[in-house]
Amino acid sequence: MINLDTIIYNVLDSIAPTYQGYPLNWNELPVISYVCEQNSSAIKAAEEITDYIVYKIDLFCNIEDDDIGMCEDINRLMNNLGFTRQQCVTLQEEGGVHIVFRYYMYIDKNNRTYSKIYRY
């Protein structure tokens, strides 16, 4: 099992204050939260060869914040790590904007990433 939480935290925290799970401080926006929704074996022989990993990222910001710029930053940095964006949904909430992303990747034990796995 490959754990990318520290890497994800460091990347997202370069954009805005970041929390694993729900933000602790809702008074200062923008803020990012993330959670690993899935980390499972995609290909397995005698040992685990490739993992399938899905991260959900939430961006909470005020209406006047540059949410488009932060979304572009999140997308660029996650793509640089080898993730593929599966979903991006913008929700208008009272006094702000909530943007939900889902990113996935296949990663092997040598840290090579893939957007698809072909099974023969």
Specify the residue positions occupied by each region the protein language model found.
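Mid-chain, well-packed structural core segment of small domains
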Residues: 58-84
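Short, charged interaction patches at domain edges and termini
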Residues: 1-5, 26, 37-52, 86-120
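Small/polar-rich, solvent-exposed N-terminal microdomains that initiate assembly or binding
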Residues: 1-44, 62, 70
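Residue-identity detector for glycine
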Residues: 21, 69, 82, 95-96
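A short beta-strand signature
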Residues: 53-57
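Aromatic-residue hotspot detector
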Residues: 34-35, 78, 83, 103
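Short secondary-structure junctions
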Residues: 16-21, 80-89
